[in-house]
C-alpha cells in the first residue's frame, strides 16, 4: 500500500484515477489546482506524486521545481495531453521519475507505471537501508 497524490485540474479524471488506485489498495489524495497541490506537498509525505503538466495556476513542472527546491525527493510522474520534446527534456532534467502522454489507455498505463515505480522504489529503499 502506498500513499499517492494525484494532481489534475480535470476533476473527473482525478476521481477516475483516485478510484482506480484505491481499488488497488493505495491511500490516495487529490488536488485539482496547483496551489492546493503545493500545500499538500509541503505538509504531507507521499510515496509517489502524479501530476498533470498543463494546469491554469501552477504547472506540474513548477510543482516539481517547488518540491525539489524544498528538498522533497518524492518521485513525480508527470502526464500531459499535449506532449512536446522541450517539456519532456525539462521534466527529465528536473528529475521526474516518468513522463506520460495522456491517451485513451491512461488509467491502465498509469496503474502499470505506478506498480513498477513502487517496486523499484521499494528495492531502492531496501538497498539504501539494509537490515
Task: Give residue ranges: language-model regions.
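Short amphipathic alpha-helix used as the core "switch/output" element in two-component signaling
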Residues: 39, 61-72, 90
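Charged docking surfaces used in two-component/phosphorelay signaling
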Residues: 15-23
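Alpha4 helix (beta4-alpha4-beta5 surface) of REC/receiver domains from two-component response regulators
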Residues: 62, 83-100
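Short hydrophobic/Thr-rich beta-strand motif most characteristic of the beta2 strand and flanking loop
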Residues: 25-32, 40
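Active-site residues of response regulator receiver
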Residues: 52
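The feature encodes the CheY-like receiver
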Residues: 14, 56
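Acidic catalytic/metal-coordinating carboxylates
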Residues: 32-36, 59-62
